[in-house]
């Protein structure tokens, strides 16, 4: 997942946040 730009709290849905 490695979504640094996405919020850590929503890491599971980081793709949507980004």
Swiss-Prot record:
Main location: secreted
UniProt entry keywords in alphabetical sequence: Secreted
Family, similarity comment: Belongs to the pHpG family.
Cellular component, GO, one term: extracellular region
Protein role: May serve as a metalloproteinase inhibitor during glandular storage. Their inhibition may be instantly disengaged, by dilution or physiochemical change, when venom is injected into tissue of the victim.
Location relative to the cell: Secreted
Note: Poly-His-poly-Gly peptide are encoded by two gene families: snake venom metalloprotease inhibitors and bradykinin-potentiating-C-type natriuretic peptides (BPP-CNP).
Tissues in which the UniProt entry reports expression: Expressed by the venom gland.
Protein name: Poly-His-poly-Gly peptide 1
Keyword Secreted in annotation: yes
